[in-house]
Amino acid sequence: MFLDTNVIVDIFRFDEESKNFQKIFELIRDAPLYISVFQIGEISDWSLTNKVDPIEPIGFLKKTMNIIPLTEDICLEGSKIKYEMRNKGEKNFSLADGIILASARSINQTLISKDGDFKQAKDVIMV
C-alpha cells in the first residue's frame, strides 16, 4: 500500500478511538508500506509547522516505509496525471498529488488517501 501524506499525518496523530484511524490500520496492517521520497519534504514541512522536530517522524518513516525515489519518468507521469485530473474537474489537483500517484503506480501499488481530489482516480482507496 502506498500512503498519501495526509494518511501518514493521521498515523502520527495516532488516535486509536478514531474510526478513520481504525479504517487505515485495517487496510495497512499486514501490507508493505510505500511513500515517495518527495513526501519526506512534506512531512518535514508538517513537522515544522506543528513545532515538531522533523528528525523523529522522518526517522520513523525511514524505518517503517519503503521509500520510492523520484525519477524523471515519475515526474513526467505526475504532470500528465495532474493534467488529466484537472480536465476531469479536479481543479485543486496539484503536481504533488500527481507525483505521489505516479509513484504509487510506478510500483503497482494502490494509494490510500483522505484527499478528495483523488476521488476520480481508479487506483486510490479513500478513507
Please place each PLM-identified region on the residue numbering:
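Short loop->beta-strand "edge-of-pocket" segments that line small-molecule binding or catalytic clefts
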Residues: 32-34, 63-69
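Active-site regions of enzymes building and remodeling cell-envelope glycoconjugates
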Residues: 65-66, 122-127
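A generic structural signal for short hydrophobic patches within well-formed alpha-helices
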Residues: 8-9, 40-43, 75, 118-119
